[in-house]
Amino acid sequence: MELYLDTANVAEVERLARIFPIAGVTTNPSIVAASKESIWDVLPRLQNAIGEEGTLFAQTMSRDAKGMVEEAKRLNNAIPGIVVKIPVTAEGLAAIKLLKKEDIVTLGTAVYSASQGLLAALAGAKYVAPYVNRVDAQGGDGIRMVQELQTLLEHHAPDSMVLAASFKTPRQALDCLLAGCQAITLPLDVAQQMLNTPAVESAIEKFEQDWKNAFGNLNL
């Protein structure tokens, strides 16, 4: 299983990378824009924060296949080994096919249906990113869509994997993993929710109080 953080906040990546067994960092245009930094400045800093073995993802901005391919090459030249995120539109599928021939690794993003995700995988995307909470917000069933996509990839595109995105709660992320999803990317607030468990803190405080009452200190 691969766990990613969905952010361009370098300081938070450095903090959480010490705690979480993360495989890397995913970004998108909105996330980079929120950082107020040039993508060409923030990407090297993010790569440094996750180390050489960490995988970094960044998205193209062009709407046409030719522009997507050109931007993907620029990203790959700047950060060798970067995974380029391509929106799964008609032009995006064409770009994914071309980038596959160039040996540039891609992720099909903005996936709202299992059939859309399957097309991205068949075109050559290594990763496919279904938007779980956004599907729910539109009246769909994000987890069911992930289950369907996971099954389709297992049968028809085994070299590709689901990298589920767009979570609002830890429960959504866990449900994706239970559905067989091999990778997820968490926004910072959801990652932090996984760490903030009041019941755990209460249990630890009780242990400490009992120990201190018995021995007068908190040392072993």
Curated annotation (Swiss-Prot):
- Lineage top rank: taxon: Bacteria
Q: Iron-sulfur: is it a keyword of this entry?
A: no
State the UniProt keywords alphabetically: Carbohydrate metabolism, Cytoplasm, Lyase, Schiff base
> In the Enzyme Commission scheme, what number(s) does this protein have?
4.1.2.-
Q: Does the keyword Lyase apply?
A: yes
Where is this chain primarily localised?
A: cytoplasm
> What are the GO cellular component annotations?
cytoplasm
Q: Which GO terms describe its molecular function?
A: fructose 6-phosphate aldolase activity
What reaction is this protein's catalytic activity? beta-D-fructose 6-phosphate = dihydroxyacetone + D-glyceraldehyde 3-phosphate
Localization annotation: Cytoplasm
Q: Which PANTHER family match?
A: FRUCTOSE-6-PHOSPHATE ALDOLASE 1-RELATED, TRANSALDOLASE
**Quaternary state and partners of this protein?**
Homodecamer.
- Give the function comment from the record: Catalyzes the reversible formation of fructose 6-phosphate from dihydroxyacetone and D-glyceraldehyde 3-phosphate via an aldolization reaction.
State the protein's name: Fructose-6-phosphate aldolase
Species this chain originates from: Salmonella agona (strain SL483)
